[in-house]
Amino acid sequence: MPIKLDNKLPALDVLRSENVFIMDENRASSQDIRPMEVLILNLMPTKEVTETQLLRLLANTPLQINVEFLYMASHKSKNTHAEHMETFYKTFDEIKDKYYDGLIVTGAPVEQMPFEEVDYWQELTRVFDWSKKHVYSTLHLCWGAQAGLYYKHGVDKVPLSEKLSGIYKQTVDMPENFLMNGFDDSFVSPHSRYTEVTLEDIKNKTDLDVVASGQEVGLSILASKDLREVYSFGHFEYDRDTLAREYRRDLEVGINPDVPANYFPGDDPSQEPKLRWNLAASTFFSNWINYAVYQETPYRLEELEDDFSFYGYL
């Protein structure tokens, strides 16, 4: 089923060229079904790229989805034109009285900083607090997952000895979890980070389930038992060339990074990487929308005001 978006959003041209099903507002309004309302808090500097990546995956789900974008007003974007932000993004003050079936909190290139030193940290914690009564299920990605665990459960991130970058094998630890419906026993996906959270901290400080993990990546996917909190430390949404662009960016600024693992054929950066995680990515996002959101969210989203006991950090 399609996603419904502003007709002027630049990502639409890319998505239509890939034969992604986009529905205009006239057609959407004639369907006798309540669309899912999803808010994307986009913390990535390359906003338009991340928009396209996430919308591509949401468009593969079997439901009509209305998508809105949120940005942190306390942070000035250096890589996205102000006109784009003003046209397609909303501030927290503009959405704080609304309700959503799902919230996606993206990663951000700030993981080597203490959380409290991130310039929009206080505003982000307001969003986390607000989501208790205004969002049914929240999907936290990469740094967004670490930020959510830190604020909601007191689980801090731990530095790795070197950057984890590449395509890594992960094992499904809970095949009975709805998020893993349709997955094989193992899958691969991109990871790109300098920090991690430990299994010991998750066991000692939360009652979250470890849904997937890997020998090289450690914890990969965590979830609350009712799927209203979902944490993914990888990057299912990454394009074929995203890690390549990150690698070349790091080279240009003199970081001298290792070649991303299991990515370039023959570890040769001049070769085009193989796309090996697309099916797992589509399955994961479809499962989140269907099982964590659609099957359980109230028809009247205002009812979320009356039922927020699922958050263990209240």
UniProtKB/Swiss-Prot annotation:
It comes from Streptococcus thermophilus (strain ATCC BAA-491 / LMD-9). This is Homoserine O-acetyltransferase. PANTHER family: HOMOSERINE O-SUCCINYLTRANSFERASE (PTHR20919:SF0). Disulfide bonds: none annotated. It is an enzyme of class 2 (transferase). GO terms for cellular component: cytoplasm. Pathway: Amino-acid biosynthesis; L-methionine biosynthesis via de novo pathway; O-acetyl-L-homoserine from L-homoserine: step 1/1. Keywords: Acyltransferase, Amino-acid biosynthesis, Cytoplasm, Methionine biosynthesis, Transferase. Its EC number is 2.3.1.31. It catalyses: L-homoserine + acetyl-CoA = O-acetyl-L-homoserine + CoA. Signal peptide: none annotated. One of its GO terms (molecular function) is homoserine O-acetyltransferase activity. Substrate binds at residues 163, 192, 249.
